[in-house]
Amino acid sequence: MEDLNIKLNAHFAGKVVRKDLTKKIKEGANVPVYVLEYLLGMYCATDDEKSMNDGVQMVKKILSDNFVRPDEAEKVKSKVKELGKYTVIDKIGVKLNDKKDIYEAEFSNLGLNGVPISSHYVKEFDKLLAGGIWCIVKMEYYFDEESKGTSPFSIESVTPIQMPNMDLEEMFEQRRQFSKEEWIDVLIRSTGMEPTQLEDTVKWHLLERMVPLVENNYNLCELGPRGTGKSHIYKEISPNSILVSGGQTTVANLFYNMSTRKIGLVGMWDTVAFDEVAGITFKDKDGIQIMKDYMASGSFARGREEKNASASMVFVGNINQSVDVLLKTSHLFDPFPEAMAYDSAFFDRMHYYLPGWEIPKMRPEFFTNEYGFITDYLAEFLREMRKRSFSDAIDKYFRLGNNLNQRDVIAVRKTVSGLIKLLYPNGEYIKEDVEEVLRYALIGRRRVKEQLKKIGGMEFYDVNFSYIDNESMNEEFVSVPEQGGGTLIPEGMNKPGHIYTVARGKTGMIGTYKLETEVVSGNGKFEKTGLNSDRDAKESIDTAFRFFKANNKNISGTISTTTKDYLMHIQDIHGVGLTGELSLAAFIALCSGALNKPVQSQMVVLGSISISGTINKVEELANVLQVCFDSGAKKILLPMVSAVDIPTVPPELFAKFQIGFYQSAEDAVFKALGVE
């Protein structure tokens, strides 16, 4: 047995289990891991191979005899009737029957309801009223002809499959026996993964998945490829979290039911996780609004009352494209449904964006065969730690930089607090430990902010997150690994007739457009593709061609509009809808193609012209320049009329470009082609 296993068994006897046993039985039994490990903990808490094998056989026997499979429900009911008494393992929920003034249990797999249950179980295990819990239930059967209308089934005893109590002080004491690296491995093995097969960054991501279970009102988003185990921990590992599969949900179910006056899932569970975020829809119009209110403050108003709850929110979903493509053409929150995808206020409430693409797809060798905590013990530890806070752990050693606003600070503090609860639950940490956690927290929040900048523009411009050492006063900046994704506009020379412009699209978002022009022998025809049926875009391209026909001799006597055909394709790279501000870019593209001379490399031309040649000002210059920068532009051609708006642009953004100004459309052509 390896050292860590020996250590675990020595310091946490009876609270650890060999995870390959879970795996072996799990593959054949459709029960949550925490139910399985509860039984394994009862019968297999030993390192003696023979006793362990006997224990495994015992657990298998219990599962085959007592675990209720939905298709065998009638068979089990018959057993209860014939034997008079029988023990079952099932998920039971309880409702109050106010007409009879009794509590009635509902069996999930057995399909029984209306079974009377003693009120003392309900008081002791209030989760029975909130979605139900897995229990070992001793049932009795007694049919009385006189008491018609009542169920012949009754409940003799209920044993919830969860830890009865948790001694945190003992946990703190034993934590001292393990190094940081060992403790991380123990936590990861407790969730069923094998840390020796994983890189350090992946280990940190797996720990981050646990933060919503240990921190109150924590909002986490994880989007990534399929098969990376995004929802596993919330569905299988913790009995205190609920996974809401993507699809329609209601305010009553999630928050508060006005008619029954019952609080919804956020009041019953420690974590509410939404699987497949792309499918989230609310029946109620105000659903997203209430969710935003809850994510910001931990409270929500329904009717006349304001309710508080402490459940964390987790959003997991799939990214169907590569991250590079997504960053170039859209933003990392793109998989969210349309009602949320461009709602910057909603995403600003996310405390952390976990990059699911950095976690490998799960393969058999990633699952552990070593010892880890019984899932229930781990879940109870996480639950108890919710009552504590380490959000001030930063202050002793560091200050946060001035680019972080109040929401950023709250997000970073919550992440730091959650990770310290997991790694140093006894509060025994040093400066380097805090710095490591702080850097990780800043990166995840900056990833949120970078996307907000793409969605909401200049309002979220401050993304240069940093922290300052209280002793040395050194300022350290953190960056996001995938930041280098934004080169839609490639380096090197374009082909003649190709040009980029940035403008506001039909959806209200600012996007990048590429115009490609081909000039072939012909008789003066002009064809345009890529416009679909967009009237404004068509008009602006037609304006450009009419202006080109009327004014091409001002550019060069060699241009012909009678012996050549012009073909133009317009591409909406960001997918934000076409724009009516393409006229100037189209005019320059036509001249560039006709002269067979390329536009300067990595240049974006801004502005538009009317049929008479009047230059129109660029609206929202700062936001437009931000999109230019994100798209990879190095040179900008601006109309002189926009010079008055330059003070609205942050100096550090303005300094990123070589900026040229033009007075007229002809002037713009010469400057774009680099001709003096």
Swiss-Prot record:
Molecular function in Gene Ontology: ATP binding; ATP-dependent peptidase activity; serine-type endopeptidase activity
A Gene Ontology BP annotation from the UniProt entry: proteolysis
Disulfide partners: none
Inducers of expression: Part of the pglZ-brxL operon.
Domain of life assignment: Bacteria
Keywords assigned by UniProt, alphabetized: Antiviral defense, Hydrolase, Protease
InterPro entries per the UniProt record, alphabetical: BrxL, BrxL-like, BrxL_N, Lon_proteolytic, Lon_Prtase, P-loop_NTPase, Ribosomal_Su5_D2-typ_SF, Ribsml_uS5_D2-typ_fold_subgr
UniProt family annotation: Belongs to the BrxL family.
Function: BREX systems (bacteriophage exclusion) provide immunity against bacteriophage. Part of a type 1 BREX system. This system allows phage adsorption but prevents phage DNA replication, without degradation of the phage DNA. Methylation of bacterial DNA by PglX probably guides self/non-self discrimination. When the brxA-brxB-brxC-pglX and pglZ-brxL operons are transformed into a susceptible B.subtilis strain (BEST7003) they confer resistance to bacteriophages SPbeta, SP16, Zeta, phi3T and SP02 and partial protection to phages SP01 and SP82G (these include lytic and temperate phage).
Entry protein name: Lon-like protease BrxL
Species this chain originates from: Bacillus cereus (strain H3081.97)
Origin organism lineage: Bacteria, Bacillati, Bacillota, Bacilli, Bacillales
Gene name per UniProt: brxL
